[in-house]
């Protein structure tokens, strides 16, 4: 690759490393083209970009993005999954895919600027999706209000019942 092309690749990688909410670095050695294509499709569905990188260019980009700690895992064939919109999606898709295809090795990653190992990535993959967490939080906030409304309605309902009974007694 000529030097200007390398500089463009490094600049693009630096932007993605800086802007991504999470990164997952993998070793794809042993996977055939069809399997990698299947993996890319699953990642694309989840809104994740998956890119094979040259380690030397990735090291330069990591230095510019101030996350040089990932240099330790930039050994051998490396591909990076960039979680731009969601921090959990790359981990979830890759961990699930690695269960089916043992050749895919998760090397490590970055979450909100902090380097994490493969075990933390596996823990991250167990977190429910953002929408589910928000739904649980709102349900938790709604429950006390619903209970309070029911208590208020219960008193009003009891008052109406008492008044109806008094009316019925007077009618007789």
Curated annotation (Swiss-Prot):
Superkingdom field: Bacteria
Gene Ontology, cellular component aspect: ribonucleoprotein complex; ribosome
Quaternary context: Part of the ribosomal stalk of the 50S ribosomal subunit. The N-terminus interacts with L11 and the large rRNA to form the base of the stalk. The C-terminus forms an elongated spine to which L12 dimers bind in a sequential fashion forming a multimeric L10(L12)X complex.
Protein name: Large ribosomal subunit protein uL10
Function: Forms part of the ribosomal stalk, playing a central role in the interaction of the ribosome with GTP-bound translation factors.
Family: Belongs to the universal ribosomal protein uL10 family.
Swiss-Prot/TrEMBL keywords: Ribonucleoprotein, Ribosomal protein, RNA-binding, rRNA-binding
Organism taxonomic ancestry: Bacteria, Bacillati, Bacillota, Clostridia, Halanaerobiales
One Pfam family of this chain: Ribosomal_L10
SUPFAM superfamilies linked to this entry: Ribosomal protein L10-like
A single GO BP: translation
């Amino acid at each position: 690759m000529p030097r200007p092309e390398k500089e463009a690749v490094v600049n693009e990688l630096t932007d993605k490393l800086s802007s991504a909410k999470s990164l997952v670095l993998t070793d794809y050695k042993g996977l055939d083209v069809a399997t990698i294509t299947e993996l890319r499709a699953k990642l694309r569905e989840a809104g994740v970009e998956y890119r094979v990188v040259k380690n030397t260019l990735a090291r330069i980009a990591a230095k510019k993005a101030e996350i040089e700690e990932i240099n330790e895992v930039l050994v051998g064939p490396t591909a990076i999954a960039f979680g731009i919109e969601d921090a959990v999606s790359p981990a979830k898709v890759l961990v699930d895919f690695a269960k089916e295809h043992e050749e895919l090795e998760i090397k490590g990653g970055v979450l909100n600027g902090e380097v994490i190992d493969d075990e933390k990535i596996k823990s991250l993959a167990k977190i429910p999706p953002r929408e589910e967490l928000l739904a649980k939080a709102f349900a938790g906030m709604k429950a006390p209000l619903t209970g309070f409304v029911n208590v208020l309605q219960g008193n009003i309902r009891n008052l109406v019942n008492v008044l109806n009974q008094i009316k019925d007694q007077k009618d007789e």
